[in-house]
């Protein structure tokens, strides 16, 4: 190690001596390097020293050189320094600068006919972008590109296609020109790939901190999902720092797969990148052939290379850049070209050229020297160095390295393949474990029962259980395509898995962590915590959180007929009926109406109330009201009744035909705002952890999850949460409860419920998905993911979904009202109240009838005389016999015999209680009556019917018989005599011809 500085110093001093003694040599070359490329200068001087010591190439001639440093992005300075070198006299110009200055030197070299060997240099080890130097069709292009063209676009596209990536992100550092991969971006866009770009700033820690400060939890989760597939286009130092930051901040998980592409990656960088990364890592770098014989590594033909450059164990050789290697080979190529010119004796002496003078001529030997260089070729540190017709070096090889599956942190790498522009990819990037397919492989599958993902279809004693469901269908599709078989069992604790206090995992995830199962499948969601311990395939179904609620049942209200009006309104209507009835009675009492002859009605309070009620229910009334005040009152009342009854009828129809029982909970936001319905989820599940994480996040702007967490975490989660999803579903069905769970599971339950008693609400944003879990580092993850993507693109996955979640199910998922309740014929429950009112009326009327009968019999028992019964029955006869006079001037009026006219009375039409006694009781032709006058009796002549008259014995009445009938009250009015004096009234038959005049109101019956 101490010898190297001494040798390097001696070599530098020796080469520098030749630099000063330019007048003693005929070989002089100029070099222009970027001021930051000090190592290029060191290697250049080492190469000149090695060649000057090799007497077989230049024999006695020695190479002298002049080196100058410029700003790589300052074309004017580069041209100025090149002119100084040409003025000294040079055979060739070697440059290791950026593309901006290279274009200016190209124009100068073409003008002065000086061969220009350009080695493109990348800034700080950043991947190169194409320089795009203008190439003329003529043979006067004196610039030769030593480094091969940039093939990063072709290599990345081939690798990404081999891995079947459909979505990934590209990170590039601030020094990289993104236009270098424009061709790649165009091609992947045409193939339908989803590609994102992100620039990595120099301060990586600040950039990561900004991400956490500006992104919400959902955005960070989506960002983590994007980072699962990434391409890093940056220098090795930046790549190592970036990987360390994202790993420490938990932005990537063990299932990530990153590709790093850079020509400048050396062996030391590879080991460091693998050590810092997690997951799978693929490295693409430019490689150079190395002799298999260790003793020949420092020999190239007849030339011996300095051991500091060819020994892989030498620190200087380990840290050399690719541009250093090409500079050494460039000097070697020029030395061989000079040797060829000297050997052919076609040497052209150097000339001092001036770039400033207008009449300056180019070098005459420039064309010959250029052709000699282009036709020559050497085998150096970069392999074969030669030039094609376009002046470029076509020889380039890329090496593809990758980490093996199943290796732990700090794992090694192996060579997966190589790529070159001629043959393309040589090798396979797939894991060797899957090269022979999966025929004969038996996988042990762990699951959790969850409808409709995994369900037991057959359970026969002594035989393995058979399972069915959506996840089982997906697993069968993978099995049929890849050819593997599987054995399935249920997780012992029937849980999906969550981290425990001691750092271990339980449930399905725990079975994978402890390697008791190969894969796990069910309604298993992809979460960041789970991705830290197991691998996941790409999602095969989107996931969202939903809420299961019970539909509002149609309550059996026997008095639904009263529902259209509020209780207060019913009370107002009842009070209005009583008030209007009372007002009608008072108006008639103050201004009694003049009733027509023969009217049997009376305007009592009872009749007024009955009339108002009858008109209200649109059944009419019996009392005619003729006064203007009463009619005005009744007109307003009828208008009021019309509006009220119409409104009632319309509302009753709406209440009985369309049940409006809508729930107020239609979203997660509504659920979080209310406290009447308790809600919860499965304890320690992904939903539970999801709500907890968001509810306790101080940076969460939405307070919805904070409110939900307060409800779910009551009594440390034991009050409102359940241990299994089935318990939560049963709790919803038979209690006042809302179950927060996977929307897909809840939708299946709601669709297939026999009573259609459930409905679901939730968000439509699918921020996560269901995936198949595998052991960390499993070789089956990528092949499973690729097949899942194929199922989704072909539409087969949608067919499987429709099998378990049909579009037209028997139940409506999202309506809080049963479809059967929305319309249809009315049932007995709808009108039960009407029947109850009718039954109450019937029972009440029967009770009143019994009471009236009892009262009548009790009253009749106090007048046991049969004659008194006849008097009571004859009261109705007196009302219909027009034989009483109300004239106040004749209290004891005597009636003539000719005026006696008993109106025939149709006895058959009278009710039993009012019918006359048998005609045989009146054989003595005398009618026994009482001496009272009923109130308001009218003078109306009636005629007895023939049947009634046939029962009487008509005889000649020689004289008119009289008897006491009426009494004058002390006040001059008539009143019923308190003493019912029995008197005989002789019956006087009416001639036959006079029967048709019985209805004459002017005639009466003489008594």
UniProtKB/Swiss-Prot annotation:
Glycans are attached at residues 293, 426, 713, 716. It catalyses: Ca(2+)(in) = Ca(2+)(out); Na(+)(in) = Na(+)(out). Residues 24-345 are annotated as: Interaction with CBLN1 homotrimer. Residues 24-566, 657-830 are extracellular. The modification Phosphoserine is found at residues 883, 890, 1006. GO terms for cellular component: AMPA glutamate receptor complex; dendritic spine; glutamatergic synapse; ionotropic glutamate receptor complex; membrane; parallel fiber to Purkinje cell synapse; plasma membrane; postsynaptic density membrane. The record marks 76 as: Essential for dimerization. It is found in: Postsynaptic cell membrane. The modification Phosphothreonine is found at residue 886. InterPro entries: ANF_lig-bd_rcpt, Glu/Gly-bd, Iono_Glu_rcpt_met, Ionotropic_Glu_rcpt, Iontro_rcpt_C, Peripla_BP_I. Changing residue 952 to A: Loss of interaction with AP4M1. Keywords: Cell membrane, Disulfide bond, Glycoprotein, Ion channel, Ion transport, Ligand-gated ion channel, Membrane, Phosphoprotein, Postsynaptic cell membrane, Receptor, Signal, Synapse, Transmembrane, Transmembrane helix, Transport. It holds the Pfam family Lig_chan-Glu_bd. It is a multi-pass membrane protein. Changing residue 954 to A: Loss of interaction with AP4M1. Residues 1-23 form the signal peptide. Disulfide bonds join 83-355, 99-131, 298-310. GO terms for biological process: cerebellar granule cell differentiation; excitatory postsynaptic potential; excitatory synapse assembly; heterophilic cell-cell adhesion via plasma membrane cell adhesion molecules; modulation of chemical synaptic transmission; positive regulation of long-term synaptic depression; positive regulation of synapse assembly; prepulse inhibition. The PDZ-binding motif mediates interaction with GOPC. Member of the ionotropic glutamate receptor family, which plays a crucial role in synaptic organization and signal transduction in the central nervous system. Although it shares structural features with ionotropic glutamate receptors, does not bind glutamate as a primary ligand. Promotes synaptogenesis and mediates the D-Serine-dependent long term depression signals and AMPA receptor endocytosis of cerebellar parallel fiber-Purkinje cell (PF-PC) synapses through the NRX1B-CBLN1-GRID2 triad complex. This is Glutamate receptor ionotropic, delta-2. The gene is Grid2.
């Amino acid at each position: 190690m101490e010898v190297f500085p001494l040798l390097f110093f001696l070599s530098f001093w020796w080469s520098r001596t030749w630099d000063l003694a330019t007048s003693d040599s005929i070989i002089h070359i100029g070099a222009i390097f970027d001021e930051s490329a000090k190592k290029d200068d060191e290697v250049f001087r080492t190469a000149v020293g090695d060649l000057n010591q090799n007497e077989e190439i230049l024999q006695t001639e020695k190479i002298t050189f002049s080196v100058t440093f410029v700003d790589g992005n300052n074309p004017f300075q580069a041209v100025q320094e090149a002119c100084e070198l040409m003025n000294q006299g040079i055979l060739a110009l070697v440059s290791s600068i950026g593309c901006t200055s290279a274009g200016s030197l190209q124009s100068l070299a073409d003008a002065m006919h000086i061969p220009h060997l350009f080695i493109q240099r990348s800034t700080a080890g950043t991947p190169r972008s194409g320089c795009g130097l203008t190439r003329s069709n003529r043979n006067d292009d004196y610039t030769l590109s030593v480094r091969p063209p940039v093939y990063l676009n072709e290599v990345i596209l081939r690798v990404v296609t081999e891995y079947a990536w459909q979505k990934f992100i590209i990170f590039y550092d601030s020094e990289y020109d993104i236009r270098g991969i424009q061709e790649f971006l165009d091609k992947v866009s045409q193939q339908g790939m989803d590609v994102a770009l992100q620039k990595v700033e120099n301060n990586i820690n600040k950039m990561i901190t900004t991400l956490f400060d500006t992104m919400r939890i959902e955005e960070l989760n989506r960002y983590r999902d994007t980072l699962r597939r990434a391409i890093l286009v940056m220098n090795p130092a930046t790549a190592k720092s970036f990987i360390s930051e994202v790993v420490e901040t938990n932005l990537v998980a063990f299932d990530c797969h990153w590709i790093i592409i850079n020509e400048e990656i050396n062996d030391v960088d590879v080991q460091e990148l693998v050590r810092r990364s997690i997951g799978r890592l693929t490295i693409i770098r430019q490689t150079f052939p190395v002799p298999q014989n260790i003793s020949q590594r420092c020999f190239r033909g007849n030339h011996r290379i300095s051991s500091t450059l060819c020994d892989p164990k030498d620190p200087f050789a380990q840290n050399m850049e690719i541009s250093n290697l090409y500079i050494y080979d460039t000097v070697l190529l020029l030395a061989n070209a000079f040797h060829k010119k000297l050997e052919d004796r076609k040497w052209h002496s150097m000339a001092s050229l001036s770039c400033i003078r207008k009449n300056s001529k180019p070098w005459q030997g420039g064309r010959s020297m250029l052709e000699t260089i282009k036709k020559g070729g050497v085998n150096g540190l970069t392999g074969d160095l030669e030039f094609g017709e376009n002046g470029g070096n076509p020889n380039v090889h890329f090496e593809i390295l990758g980490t093996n599956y199943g290796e732990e942190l700090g794992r090694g790498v192996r060579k997966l393949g190589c790529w070159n522009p001629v043959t393309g990819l040589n090798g396979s990037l797939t894991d060797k474990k899957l090269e022979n397919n999966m025929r004969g492989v038996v996988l042990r599958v762990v699951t959790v029962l969850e409808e409709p993902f995994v369900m037991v279809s057959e359970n026969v004693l002594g035989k393995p259980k058979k399972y069915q469901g959506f996840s089982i269908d997906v697993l069968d599709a993978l099995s049929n395509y890849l050819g593997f078989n599987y054995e399935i069992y249920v997780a012992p604790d029937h849980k999906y898995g969550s981290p425990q206090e001691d750092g271990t995992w339980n449930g399905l995830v725990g079975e994978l962590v402890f390697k008791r199962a190969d894969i796990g499948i069910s309604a298993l969601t992809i979460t960041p915590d789970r991705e830290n311990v197991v691998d996941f395939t790409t999602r095969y179904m989107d996931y969202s959180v939903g809420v299961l609620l019970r539909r509002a049942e149609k309550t059996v209200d026997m008095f639904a007929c009263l529902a259209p009006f509020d209780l207060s309104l019913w009370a107002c209507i009842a009070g209005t009926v009583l008030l209007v009835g009372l007002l009608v009675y008072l108006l008639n009492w103050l201004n009694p109406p003049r009733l027509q002859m023969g009217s049997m009605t009376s305007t009592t309070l009872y009749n007024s109330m009955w009339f108002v009620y009858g008109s209200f229910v649109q059944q009419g009334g019996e009392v005619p009201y003729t006064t203007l005040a009463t009619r005005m009152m009744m007109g307003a009342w009828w208008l009021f009744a019309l509006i009220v009854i119409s409104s009632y009828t319309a509302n009753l129809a709406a209440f009985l035909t369309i049940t409006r029982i809508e729930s107020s909970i239609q979203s997660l936001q509504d659920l979080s705002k209310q406290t009447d319905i308790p809600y919860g989820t499965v304890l320690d599940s992904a939903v539970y952890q999801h709500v907890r994480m968001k509810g306790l996040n101080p940076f969460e702007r939405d307070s919805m999850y904070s409110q939900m967490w307060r409800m779910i975490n009551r009594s440390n989660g034991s009050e409102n949460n359940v241990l299994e999803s089935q318990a939560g579903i049963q709790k919803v069905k038979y209690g006042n409860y809302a179950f927060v769970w996977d929307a897909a599971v809840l939708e299946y339950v709601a669709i297939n419920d026999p009573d259609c008693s459930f409905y679901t609400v939730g968000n439509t944003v699918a921020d996560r998905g269901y995936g198949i879990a595998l052991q960390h580092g499993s070789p089956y993850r990528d092949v499973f993911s690729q097949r899942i993507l194929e199922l989704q693109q072909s539409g087969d996955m949608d067919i499987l979904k429709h099998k378990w979640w049909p579009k037209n199910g028997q139940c409506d998922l999202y309506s809080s009202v049963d479809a059967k309740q929305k319309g249809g014929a009315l049932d007995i429950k709808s009108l039960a109240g009407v029947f109850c009112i009718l039954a109450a009326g019937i029972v009440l009327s029967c009770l009143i009838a019994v009471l009236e009968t009892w009262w009548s019999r009790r009253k009749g028992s106090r007048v046991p005389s049969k004659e008194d019964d006849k008097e009571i029955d004859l009261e109705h006869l007196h009302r219909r016999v027009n034989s009483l006079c109300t004239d106040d001037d004749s209290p004891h009026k005597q009636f003539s015999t000719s005026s006696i006219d008993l109106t025939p009375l149709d006895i058959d039409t009278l009710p039993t209680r009012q019918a006359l006694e048998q005609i045989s009781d009146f054989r003595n032709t005398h009618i026994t009556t009482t001496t009272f006058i009923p109130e308001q009796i009218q003078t109306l002549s009636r005629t007895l019917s023939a049947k009634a008259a046939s029962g009487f014995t008509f005889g000649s009445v020689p004289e008119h018989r009289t008897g006491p009938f009426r009494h004058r009250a002390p006040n001059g009015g008539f009143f019923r005599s308190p003493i019912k004096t029995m008197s005989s009234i002789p019956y006087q038959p009416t001639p036959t011809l006079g029967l048709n005049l019985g209805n004459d109101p002017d005639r009466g019956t003489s008594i």
